[in-house]
C-alpha cells in the first residue's frame, strides 16, 4: 500500500480541501482538512476516515493509522 492510494481513496470519498499522509512501513499518519469534519466529535471524524479504508485495514495492507482531522476554520487557527 502506498500513501498515494490512501490519498486518492479519501479524496474520492470525502470532500477534503487538503490531505497529507506520511508512511512508515504499514503505519500511516493522516492529516485531513475539510468542512466535512465541522461540528463532529473526534470519534465521528475518525469514522469518516476509517470507513473508506476499512477494506485495506481488514486485508492488513494498513496496520496502524494515526488521524488528525480539522475543519477549514480549525486548520486556519492551528496554522497561526
Curated annotation (Swiss-Prot):
It holds the Pfam family BolA. It comes from the Bacteria. InterPro entries: BolA, BolA-like_sf, BolA/IbaG_stress_morph_reg. Belongs to the BolA/IbaG family. This is Uncharacterized protein BUsg_372. It comes from Buchnera aphidicola subsp. Schizaphis graminum (strain Sg). The lineage of its organism: Bacteria, Pseudomonadati, Pseudomonadota, Gammaproteobacteria, Enterobacterales.
